[in-house]
């Protein structure tokens, strides 16, 4: 057998990581706290985790919250695993799953999540790609029922057109907008902001970061 490419090696290491990677996550729908985290802490998820800098730092700074990193691509999630395995302390409040966001209802029950982060997800700028945008009406209506009452969706992007599109979708659907800005670092949310790797790179080059927050104000 020839040597596996590094990407495949990373994926295999991720899949074999019983400490952080959750295989067959649909088995735990409605049972994440009971069977996986074994506590009653709030659960926050990041959809489109990428290299995982954001959720890694969130988990490191908030031990009383359970975090789940979600991405479609295992190879990318392996980079988060590297961070977790090289951390000087073992984090028990973070797990990794690899699924397509459109199947998220198979993984979580209604009102199971406290917060959903959408950080610098692909804007899919072409009109005929709108169906792939994670802030279109299909996805937002998919995400909101997973939230507890008053749970939040937090969305950040450096793409102004994508931000304006997402803002329009929220308003057209009469979602409860609690915060919106075209300059995050000049806002009240700047103090508690945790950057992604992408965000740090482009904000250092002078790009403004846009953010909006949607609240689930409908009781389940």
From Swiss-Prot:
Residues noted as binding S-adenosyl-L-methionine in the record, renumbered to the chain: 46, 71, 100, 122
Disulfide bonds: none
Cellular component terms (Gene Ontology): tRNA methyltransferase complex
EC number assigned by the record: 2.1.1.33
Alphabetical UniProt keywords: Methyltransferase, S-adenosyl-L-methionine, Transferase, tRNA processing
Pathway this chain belongs to: tRNA modification; N(7)-methylguanine-tRNA biosynthesis
A GO molecular-function annotation: tRNA (guanine(46)-N7)-methyltransferase activity
Active-site annotation: 122
Catalytic activity field: guanosine(46) in tRNA + S-adenosyl-L-methionine = N(7)-methylguanosine(46) in tRNA + S-adenosyl-L-homocysteine
Residue positions binding substrate: 126, 158, 196-199
Function field: Catalyzes the formation of N(7)-methylguanine at position 46 (m7G46) in tRNA.
HAMAP family reported for this sequence: tRNA_methyltr_TrmB
Family affiliation: Belongs to the class I-like SAM-binding methyltransferase superfamily. TrmB family.
Protein name as it appears in the record: tRNA (guanine-N(7)-)-methyltransferase
Organism, scientific name: Malacoplasma penetrans (strain HF-2) (Mycoplasma penetrans)
Species classification: Bacteria, Bacillati, Mycoplasmatota, Mycoplasmoidales, Mycoplasmoidaceae
């Amino acid at each position: 057998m020839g040597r596996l490419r590094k990407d495949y090696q990373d994926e295999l290491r991720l899949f074999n990581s019983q400490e952080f990677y959750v295989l067959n996550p649909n088995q735990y729908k409605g049972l994440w706290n009971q069977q996986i985290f074994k506590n009653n802490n709030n659960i926050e998820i990041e959809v489109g985790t990428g290299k995982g800098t954001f959720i890694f730092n969130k988990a490191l700074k908030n031990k009383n919250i359970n975090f789940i990193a979600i991405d479609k691509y295992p190879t990318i999630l392996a980079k988060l695993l590297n961070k977790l395995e090289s951390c000087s302390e073992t984090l028990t409040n973070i797990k990794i799953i690899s699924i397509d966001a459109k199947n998220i209802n198979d993984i979580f029950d209604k009102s199971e999540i406290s917060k959903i982060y959408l950080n610098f997800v692909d804007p899919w700028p072409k009109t005929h790609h709108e169906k792939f945008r994670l802030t279109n009406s299909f996805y937002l209506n998919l995400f909101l029922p997973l939230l507890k009452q008053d749970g939040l969706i937090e969305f950040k992007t450096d793409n102004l057109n994508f931000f304006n599109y997402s803002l329009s979708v929220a308003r057209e659907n009469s979602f409860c907008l609690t915060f919106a800005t075209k300059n995050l670092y000049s806002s009240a949310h700047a103090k508690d902001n945790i950057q992604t790797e992408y965000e740090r790179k482009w904000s250092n080059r002078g790009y403004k970061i846009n953010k909006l927050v949607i609240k689930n104000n409908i009781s389940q």
